[in-house]
Protein backbone atom coordinates (compact mmCIF):
# COMPACT_ATOMS: atom_id res chain seq x y z
CA UNK A 1 0.00 0.00 0.00
CA UNK A 2 1.30 3.44 -0.93
CA UNK A 3 2.04 5.89 1.87
CA UNK A 4 0.07 9.12 1.73
CA UNK A 5 2.99 11.52 1.39
CA UNK A 6 2.93 14.24 -1.26
CA UNK A 7 6.37 14.31 -2.88
CA UNK A 8 7.45 17.31 -4.95
CA UNK A 9 10.07 16.80 -7.65
CA UNK A 10 11.45 19.06 -10.35
CA UNK A 11 14.43 20.99 -11.60
CA UNK A 12 16.16 23.61 -9.48
CA UNK A 13 14.09 26.77 -9.33
CA UNK A 14 10.77 24.94 -9.71
CA UNK A 15 9.67 26.07 -6.25
CA UNK A 16 9.71 22.72 -4.46
CA UNK A 17 10.74 24.24 -1.11
CA UNK A 18 8.49 27.31 -1.09
CA UNK A 19 5.52 25.45 -2.56
CA UNK A 20 6.13 22.50 -0.22
CA UNK A 21 6.06 24.69 2.89
CA UNK A 22 2.82 26.39 1.83
CA UNK A 23 1.23 23.14 0.71
CA UNK A 24 2.05 21.46 4.03
CA UNK A 25 0.49 24.38 5.89
CA UNK A 26 -2.65 24.24 3.75
CA UNK A 27 -2.96 20.47 4.25
CA UNK A 28 -2.08 20.58 7.96
CA UNK A 29 0.90 18.28 7.37
CA UNK A 30 4.56 18.30 8.29
CA UNK A 31 7.06 19.48 5.69
CA UNK A 32 10.31 17.61 5.01
CA UNK A 33 13.12 18.55 2.63
CA UNK A 34 15.52 15.81 1.65
CA UNK A 35 18.33 18.37 1.55
CA UNK A 36 17.54 19.23 5.20
CA UNK A 37 17.76 15.54 6.13
CA UNK A 38 21.21 15.46 4.53
CA UNK A 39 22.50 18.68 6.10
CA UNK A 40 21.25 17.64 9.55
CA UNK A 41 22.98 14.28 9.26
CA UNK A 42 26.23 15.70 7.89
CA UNK A 43 26.34 18.91 9.91
CA UNK A 44 27.24 20.98 6.85
CA UNK A 45 25.51 22.78 3.99
CA UNK A 46 24.95 21.15 0.58
CA UNK A 47 27.48 23.39 -1.25
CA UNK A 48 30.11 22.43 1.33
CA UNK A 49 29.33 18.73 0.89
CA UNK A 50 29.79 19.14 -2.87
CA UNK A 51 33.03 21.07 -2.35
CA UNK A 52 34.61 18.69 0.14
CA UNK A 53 33.23 15.31 -0.89
CA UNK A 54 31.94 15.79 -4.45
CA UNK A 55 28.72 14.95 -6.22
CA UNK A 56 29.16 11.18 -5.89
CA UNK A 57 29.10 11.35 -2.08
CA UNK A 58 26.17 13.75 -2.17
CA UNK A 59 24.19 11.28 -4.31
CA UNK A 60 24.97 8.53 -1.77
CA UNK A 61 23.59 10.78 0.96
CA UNK A 62 20.47 11.34 -1.14
CA UNK A 63 19.97 7.57 -1.31
CA UNK A 64 20.12 7.49 2.50
CA UNK A 65 17.57 10.32 2.64
CA UNK A 66 15.21 8.31 0.42
CA UNK A 67 15.54 5.40 2.84
CA UNK A 68 14.64 7.77 5.70
CA UNK A 69 11.49 8.75 3.79
CA UNK A 70 10.24 5.17 4.15
CA UNK A 71 9.51 6.10 7.79
CA UNK A 72 7.39 9.12 6.79
CA UNK A 73 3.64 9.09 6.28
CA UNK A 74 1.20 11.91 5.64
CA UNK A 75 3.90 14.49 4.99
CA UNK A 76 4.80 16.90 2.21
CA UNK A 77 8.30 16.18 0.92
CA UNK A 78 10.48 18.37 -1.31
CA UNK A 79 13.32 16.50 -2.99
CA UNK A 80 16.54 17.87 -4.38
CA UNK A 81 16.38 18.38 -8.14
CA UNK A 82 18.61 15.41 -8.95
CA UNK A 83 17.28 13.01 -6.32
CA UNK A 84 14.67 11.27 -8.52
CA UNK A 85 17.12 11.02 -11.42
CA UNK A 86 18.85 7.79 -10.50
CA UNK A 87 17.81 4.33 -11.60
CA UNK A 88 14.90 3.08 -9.51
CA UNK A 89 14.54 6.24 -7.42
CA UNK A 90 11.33 7.51 -8.99
CA UNK A 91 9.81 4.06 -8.56
CA UNK A 92 10.69 4.21 -4.86
CA UNK A 93 9.26 7.72 -4.50
CA UNK A 94 6.04 6.66 -6.26
CA UNK A 95 5.67 3.88 -3.69
CA UNK A 96 6.03 6.41 -0.86
CA UNK A 97 3.25 8.74 -1.97
CA UNK A 98 1.84 10.87 -4.75
CA UNK A 99 4.70 12.35 -6.75
CA UNK A 100 4.07 15.80 -8.25
CA UNK A 101 6.42 17.22 -10.88
CA UNK A 102 6.67 21.01 -10.62
CA UNK A 103 7.66 21.89 -14.16
CA UNK A 104 8.20 25.19 -15.88
CA UNK A 105 9.94 27.16 -18.57
CA UNK A 106 13.66 26.35 -18.31
CA UNK A 107 14.75 29.99 -18.57
CA UNK A 108 12.43 30.95 -15.74
CA UNK A 109 13.56 28.00 -13.59
CA UNK A 110 17.22 28.94 -14.03
CA UNK A 111 16.53 32.61 -13.26
CA UNK A 112 14.72 31.62 -10.05
CA UNK A 113 17.55 29.27 -9.05
CA UNK A 114 20.20 31.93 -9.67
CA UNK A 115 18.25 34.43 -7.53
CA UNK A 116 18.08 31.88 -4.71
CA UNK A 117 21.86 31.33 -4.88
CA UNK A 118 24.02 28.47 -3.50
CA UNK A 119 23.27 26.00 -6.29
CA UNK A 120 26.25 23.65 -6.79
CA UNK A 121 24.71 22.09 -9.92
CA UNK A 122 24.30 25.55 -11.49
CA UNK A 123 27.67 27.06 -10.61
CA UNK A 124 30.17 27.25 -13.46
CA UNK A 125 27.85 25.66 -16.03
CA UNK A 126 27.09 27.22 -19.37
CA UNK A 127 23.51 27.72 -20.51
CA UNK A 128 23.94 24.76 -22.88
CA UNK A 129 25.18 22.55 -20.04
CA UNK A 130 22.25 23.54 -17.82
CA UNK A 131 19.83 22.78 -20.66
CA UNK A 132 21.50 19.38 -21.22
CA UNK A 133 21.17 18.63 -17.49
CA UNK A 134 17.48 19.54 -17.59
CA UNK A 135 16.87 17.40 -20.69
CA UNK A 136 18.66 14.45 -19.04
CA UNK A 137 16.48 14.76 -15.93
CA UNK A 138 13.19 15.39 -17.70
CA UNK A 139 12.37 11.70 -18.43
CA UNK A 140 12.66 10.91 -14.72
CA UNK A 141 10.41 13.83 -13.77
CA UNK A 142 7.84 12.69 -16.35
CA UNK A 143 7.36 9.48 -14.34
CA UNK A 144 5.64 11.50 -11.57
CA UNK A 145 1.97 10.77 -10.92
CA UNK A 146 1.02 14.40 -11.55
CA UNK A 147 2.51 17.40 -13.31
CA UNK A 148 1.87 21.07 -12.51
CA UNK A 149 3.19 23.93 -14.66
CA UNK A 150 4.69 26.71 -12.52
CA UNK A 151 5.57 29.08 -15.37
CA UNK A 152 4.73 32.66 -14.47
CA UNK A 153 3.12 31.70 -11.16
CA UNK A 154 3.95 32.55 -7.58
CA UNK A 155 3.94 29.91 -4.84
CA UNK A 156 0.32 30.54 -3.76
CA UNK A 157 -1.02 29.92 -7.26
CA UNK A 158 1.17 26.85 -7.69
CA UNK A 159 -0.17 25.46 -4.39
CA UNK A 160 -3.73 26.01 -5.66
CA UNK A 161 -2.87 24.07 -8.83
CA UNK A 162 -1.23 21.25 -6.87
CA UNK A 163 -4.26 20.98 -4.58
CA UNK A 164 -6.59 20.86 -7.61
CA UNK A 165 -4.44 18.17 -9.26
CA UNK A 166 -4.41 16.12 -6.04
CA UNK A 167 -8.20 16.44 -5.69
CA UNK A 168 -8.71 15.39 -9.32
CA UNK A 169 -6.37 12.41 -8.92
CA UNK A 170 -8.10 11.36 -5.70
CA UNK A 171 -11.53 11.60 -7.38
CA UNK A 172 -10.30 9.56 -10.35
CA UNK A 173 -8.95 6.83 -8.02
CA UNK A 174 -12.29 6.75 -6.19
CA UNK A 175 -14.09 6.03 -9.48
CA UNK A 176 -11.98 2.95 -10.23
Give the predicted meaning of each segment.
Residues 8:
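Hydrophobic anchor at the beta1->P-loop junction of P-loop NTPases
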Residues 30-94, 118, 127, 138-140:
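ATP-dependent small-molecule kinase phosphotransfer cores
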Residues 1-2, 22, 26, 72, ...:
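NTP-dependent small-molecule kinase module
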Residues 17:
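Walker A/P-loop
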Residues 11-14:
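P-loop (Walker A) phosphate-binding loop of NTP-binding proteins
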Residues 81-83, 105-107, 153-154:
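Short glycine-rich anion-binding loops that position phosphate/pyrophosphate groups of nucleotides
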Residues 95-139:
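A glycine- and Lys/Arg-enriched "phosphate-lid" helix/loop adjacent to the NTP-binding pocket
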Amino acid sequence: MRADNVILVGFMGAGKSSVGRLLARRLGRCFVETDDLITAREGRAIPEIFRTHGETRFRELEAEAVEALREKSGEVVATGGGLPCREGRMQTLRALGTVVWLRGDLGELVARARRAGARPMLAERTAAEVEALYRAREPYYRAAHLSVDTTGLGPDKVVARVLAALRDAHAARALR
